[in-house]
A protein has these predicted regions:
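Flexible beta-alpha connector loops of hexameric P-loop NTPases
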Residues: 56-63, 84, 124-134, 166-175
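Generic beta-strand/beta-sheet core signal
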Residues: 31-33, 86-88, 118-119, 155-156, ...
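Switch/connector loops and helix/strand junctions flanking conserved nucleotide-binding motifs
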Residues: 36-42, 50-53, 124-127, 161-166, ...
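Internal alpha/beta scaffold segment
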Residues: 1-5
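Amphipathic alpha-helical transducer elements in NTP-driven molecular machines
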Residues: 38, 65-68, 72, 96, ...
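Phosphate-binding/switch region of NTP-binding enzymes
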Residues: 7-11, 142-249
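Cytosolic-facing regulatory segments adjacent to core modules
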Residues: 9-111, 236
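Phosphate-binding/switch loop-helix module in NTP-utilizing enzymes
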Residues: 83-146
Length: 249
């Protein structure tokens, strides 16, 4: 499970899975409930072309010929990526039916890896209370990850607790915690790994946490839960989100 800036990070993962595993057969199913699929493709173009999405989408100026040729070239490459998008919010049961259909149609009986990405959990069509909906969604994902060679990457939001003045002004409370994740109990228990991506700079924090880490142009990845390897840890990235990218420090 991943929380913010979630969509850019997950979008990068989806294409990297394909780019970095050229000898593997992969099927990627993305529930893009927060953003329509073509916007996700736009972010991929931004990352690969080193152009901001505002530049690519702008109606004020035309793209120069070289950039336009690159857009066409990369777009043709992306058409070959084994990635499918679901744009419309679904109930947990509807999501389960879609996952089962894709598994039976494209994966079952093959040696393909099946990757399910869900962005994001709180946009699921409700079947009752938020807690009831999240519990049912987690049941779906626990069942889905039992398919052979299947991984589930679900995205969620942080709540507003981390933005409180008490947290911002106390360096011992800067780091994300389990309770900062919306619907934390259901999502945390169902996940093998829980990762929080945090930009303390946008909260006005200049020195981050008890180690007084620099925040300028930094993004920190906190692994709060690691079922196989134990202790939590923090990874540091350079902020390259203008191009929908993160650079490992």
């Amino acid at each position: 499970m991943i929380t913010k800036p979630k969509s850019s990070f997950a979008n990068e993962i989806s294409t990297d899975i394909v780019d970095l595993n050229p000898d593997e057969e992969i099927v990627i199913l993305i529930f893009s409930l927060e953003m329509v699929g073509f916007r996700q493709v736009g972010r991929t173009l931004s990352s690969k072309l080193r152009k901001t999405t505002s530049t690519l989408y702008s109606s004020e100026t035309d793209l120069d010929d070289d950039t336009f040729r690159k857009v066409i070239s990369v777009s043709n490459q992306l058409k070959e990526y084994p990635i499918w998008f679901v744009d419309n919010p679904t109930t947990p049961k509807e999501a389960e039916d879609i996952i089962r259909y894709f598994y039976n149609t494209y994966v079952k009986g093959t040696n393909k890896h099946f990757v399910i990405m869900y962005d994001h959990a709180l946009l699921t069509k409700p079947i009752g209370s938020v807690i009831e909906t999240m519990q049912e969604l987690e049941r779906v994902f626990i069942s889905a990850k039992k398919y052979p060679m299947t991984s589930v990457l679900q995205l969620a939001q942080m709540n507003r607790n981390i933005e409180s003045p008490e947290r911002i002004n106390n360096f011992l409370s800067h780091y994300p915690m389990r309770s900062d994740i919306s619907s934390a109990d259901a999502l945390f228990q169902a996940s093998d790994y829980v990762i929080v991506i945090h930009r303390p700079e946008i909260l006005g924090i200049q020195e981050y946490g008890p180690s007084h880490l620099s925040t300028q142009n930094k993004v920190y990845l906190h692994i709060l839960k690691n079922r196989d390897a134990g202790k939590p840890c923090i990874l540091e990235f350079q902020n390259d989100l203008a191009y929908n990218n993160l650079i490992e420090s």
